[in-house]
């Protein structure tokens, strides 16, 4: 029977990044997913690498800054191996914040009204009590990113099993021995639960994640407007909506945060609300047409911090619970979990994110 050094449960951006990274260290890696790679939370994400967000938990900020800084090299290596572009954009973010919100991110500066008019002429001016800032942030297309990660992992020799849900983590002599699906057993000395919102469903030691639903909308230019200049060049973030331009002229509008269990349906009222909020900021979006709407299930932990590290079962690790920051944290998560699994020196103290904090 074939064996692996590590089995990763979940082929989202976290599982794919970790599998690719572990394989580069020489480990024999298997990734198992209940569906298709990158088709759950990662597929639904907006892709903002928003390390300057003032609402990030303080404990998470050092990790977000480090992971955001890793992105250019991460994508460069990924493109070399996959021959696919994840559409990494570095135009930056224009953020409208309520006065008094602290924006202490290096490189942030106030956006003057005349500058906004010159750089983003389609935008309305911020209302009274709201300030505008330029943030040194990037964005990426998560669907293209996961496609590139899947191809790079396969290129490296990572095994991937799709359409097969892991039901149990197998245990022998007090440590992990592999995983079990309805039809097969997969032996490994290391197992990593990267199953996102579904991480709690894998026994034993189900991790305390729950789904946090987020609805998003995609608008595209009318057929006759495709040759015109893009409506916006920068990511635009307000307290009510964020607007994310893609290089192919699509614009994403998001997003809700809902406690709706595993329900991934969209509703017309929410789609219309997001659309109207975007039109209020960028009136020309009203001339575009709604192309698609979808919902994803973010993996939320009880304290909204990621769950990273070894569980109480030797050899059984967790890398989940990234909530709204999985895309941003993927490069660093893969690096830190690889360091932990291979016994290398850790760049960051992972104790605040340990699965054992919920014991």
Walk through the language-model features, giving the residues of each:
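Short beta-strand to alpha-helix junction loop
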Residues: 62, 99-100, 132-151, 265-270, ...
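C-terminal catalytic lobe of FAD-dependent flavoproteins
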Residues: 142, 282-359
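Dinucleotide-binding Rossmann-like beta1-alpha1 core, especially the glycine-rich loop
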Residues: 47-122, 128-129, 277-279
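Beta1/beta-strand and adjacent pyrophosphate-binding region of the FAD-binding site
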Residues: 2-14, 30
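Glycine-rich FAD pyrophosphate-binding loop
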Residues: 23-44
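Helical element adjacent to the flavin cofactor pocket in flavoenzyme catalytic cores
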Residues: 132-190, 194
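Active-site substrate-recognition segment that forms the wall
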Residues: 20-24, 47-49, 84-89, 185-186, ...
